[in-house]
């Protein structure tokens, strides 16, 4: 029974990971620019996003496995759940967690920078003329990546030595063996993870809070777009007025622009440029309305119009969900600030829940019927992940106030896609902490586990509360009952995250106070978005129209060049055949 139950839990996790790979692929293919597709960049981004989401969504599996050892109705362990069996489950989970966390760090700090530099080193002309080989690109990218490799080594060395600073002889091999037996290697990974979560929290506070406020509102208050009939009519009127003014100027000079004054010539040149822009804008609007499009695109546009009311409904639902998330985070942070038994000394760890948290309650109740809690947790994580993407799209990739890259659907360069993926990886690490320790702390620590709070008689191996249901209590971290210590098993993720804040209290303080910054920015952005009416970015629209026109011209030129090349090669082939026949 135990083997079947654990196998089913892992099977559900495998299905979820496959779904995550599909979600990551859709995200990457939606945002990348079609003109600059790079297979190595696409594959790296998909693997990175899938791995991080798989790390976060291991939490319900962790909770389900440790909770499966308990009979919550009786507050005692299952008959098969011996201590050795529980230790085996925990060891398996630890191996998976350490593998995923190490892979996350490797992808974020080594692989993504390497692929970024590898793409930057690519020179299309030099590659076609065989002046640049793949080995040269690889070596140049590796030289730039060495600095990131050094950062990783320094991170692990700091985490390896700082917690166990000792005097005396510590430079030999025996000392390293002693550190490993004391599990200092695990502390090094803990320090590296704590630092990455700290960096991720800065991005999480800025981007996820912004996206959490904007995502539902953009679904409800959809701004004017190129599909708007009003914009199409306005463009037609502007184009008509422009051409009328051009005719007036051309009539004044009778077709000879040299007869015009310098002021009129400048006006005519401006009108000609404006006419080209308006024509491109009109063509883009026609394509958005399905004109000159294939039947599949026209069908998609019709479906979009039909499902517009459902978009409004989903916006309202997401707004309520975002508000519940905000309230749950606020309640937990207040609870931690008031009732944490160790305050800043251990990162405001909460012994047990003192304030009702709606999201935590939903997860604890749904965890009694696996995989209901897994479905809800997955939807919550994907909602926060989508909010992070919306936040990055709205704010852009910036250095201080300078926008370096813009993230837009169908217009994101490979470099921007790699940077956005690295940012999302760090954000998801911070999200792992927030969902486990802030949104649903009781669920992520013990799930639905309970224990029988009564004295153990000499003839009993476990307390029996079958007749005393009122003595069955939920497990908590400060339960001082001997029965609780024998029965309750904390999840691996809660143990690992609490170890970060216990061993390095400054990380815990940053993690805690960053939540208040998140709540404040969300409130500010939400109020601003409600009061501000969305406007159409005409400059961006004109750039999109110009880019589409360039793409069309390049495609036509490429087609003509290929046709010409085929004609030349076929002519040479026929000439060679004639020469051979004559010979």
UniProtKB/Swiss-Prot annotation:
Membrane-topology annotation of the record: Multi-pass membrane protein
A single GO BP: protein localization to vacuole
A GO molecular-function descriptor: cobalamin binding
Residue span of region Disordered: 541-562
Compositionally biased tracts (Acidic residues): 541-552
Places the protein is found: Lysosome membrane
Keyword Membrane in record: yes
Keyword annotations of the record: Cobalamin, Cobalt, Lysosome, Membrane, Transmembrane, Transmembrane helix, Transport
One GO cellular component term: vacuolar membrane
Keyword field contains Transport: yes
Transmembrane segments: 8-28, 41-61, 95-115, 145-165, 188-208, 312-332, 347-367, 375-395, 418-438, 506-526
Function: Probable lysosomal cobalamin transporter. Required to export cobalamin from lysosomes allowing its conversion to cofactors.
Sequence similarity: Belongs to the LIMR family. LMBRD1 subfamily.
Name by which UniProt lists this protein: Probable lysosomal cobalamin transporter
Provenance organism: Aspergillus oryzae (strain ATCC 42149 / RIB 40)
């Amino acid at each position: 029974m135990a083997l079947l139950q654990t196998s089913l839990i892992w099977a559900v996790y495998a299905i979820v990971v496959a779904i995550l790979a599909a979600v990551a692929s859709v995200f990457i293919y939606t945002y990348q620019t079609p003109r600059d597709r790079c297979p190595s960049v696409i594959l790296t981004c998909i693997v990175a996003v899938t791995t991080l989401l798989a790390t976060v969504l291991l939490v319900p599996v962790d909770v389900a496995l440790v909770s499966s050892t308990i009979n919550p109705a009786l507050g005692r362990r299952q008959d098969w759940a011996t201590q050795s069996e529980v230790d085996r489950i925990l060891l398996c989970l630890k191996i998976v967690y350490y593998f995923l966390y190490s892979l996350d760090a490797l992808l974020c700090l080594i692989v993504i920078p390497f692929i970024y530099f590898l793409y930057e080193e690519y020179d299309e002309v030099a590659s076609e003329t065989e002046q640049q080989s793949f080995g040269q690109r690889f070596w140049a990218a590796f030289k730039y990546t060495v600095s990131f490799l050094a950062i990783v080594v320094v991170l692990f060395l700091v985490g390896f030595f700082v917690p166990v600073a000792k005097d005396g002889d510590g430079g030999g091999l025996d000392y390293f063996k002693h550190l490993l037996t004391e599990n200092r290697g695990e502390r090094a990974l803990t320090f590296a993870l704590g630092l990455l979560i700290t960096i991720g929290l800065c991005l999480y506070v800025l981007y996820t809070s912004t996206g959490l406020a904007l995502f539902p509102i953009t679904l409800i208050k959809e701004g004017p777009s190129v599909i708007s009939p009003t914009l199409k009519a306005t463009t037609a009127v502007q184009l008509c007025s422009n051409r009328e003014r051009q005719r007036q100027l051309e009539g004044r000079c009778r077709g000879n622009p040299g007869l015009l004054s310098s002021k009129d010539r400048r006006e005519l040149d401006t009108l000609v440029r404006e006419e080209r822009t308006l024509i491109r804008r009109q063509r883009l609007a026609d394509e958005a309305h399905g004109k000159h499009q294939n039947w599949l695109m026209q069908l998609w546009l019709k479906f979009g119009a039909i499902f517009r009311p459902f978009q409004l409904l989903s916006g309202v639902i997401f707004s309520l969900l975002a508000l519940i998330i905000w309230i749950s985070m606020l309640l937990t942070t207040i609870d931690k600030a008031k009732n944490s038994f160790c305050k800043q000394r251990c990162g405001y760890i909460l012994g047990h829940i003192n304030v009702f948290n709606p999201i935590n309650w939903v997860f604890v109740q749904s965890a009694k019927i696996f995989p209901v809690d897994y479905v809800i947790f997955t939807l919550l994580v994907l909602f926060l992940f989508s909010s992070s993407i919306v936040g990055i799209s709205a704010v852009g990739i910036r250095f201080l106030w300078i926008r370096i890259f813009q993230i837009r659907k169908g217009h994101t360069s490979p470099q921007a896609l790699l940077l956005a993926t690295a940012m999302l990886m760090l954000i998801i690490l911070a999200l792992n902490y927030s969902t486990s320790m802030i949104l649903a702390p009781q669920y992520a620590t013990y799930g639905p586990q309970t224990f029988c709070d009564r004295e153990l008689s000499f003839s009993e191996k476990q307390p029996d509360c079958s007749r005393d249901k009122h003595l069955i209590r939920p497990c908590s971290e400060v339960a001082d009952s001997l029965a609780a210590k024998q029965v309750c098993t904390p999840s691996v993720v809660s143990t690992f995250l609490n170890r970060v804040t216990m061993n390095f209290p400054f990380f815990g303080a940053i993690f805690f106070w960053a939540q208040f910054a998140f709540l404040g920015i969300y409130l500010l952005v939400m109020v601003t978005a409600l009061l501000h009416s969305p406007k159409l970015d005409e400059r961006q629209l004109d750039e999109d129209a110009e880019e589409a026109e360039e793409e069309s011209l390049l495609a036509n030129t490429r087609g003509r060049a290929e046709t010409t090349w085929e004609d030349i090669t076929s002519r040479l082939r026929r000439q060679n055949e004639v020469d051979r026949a004559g010979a």
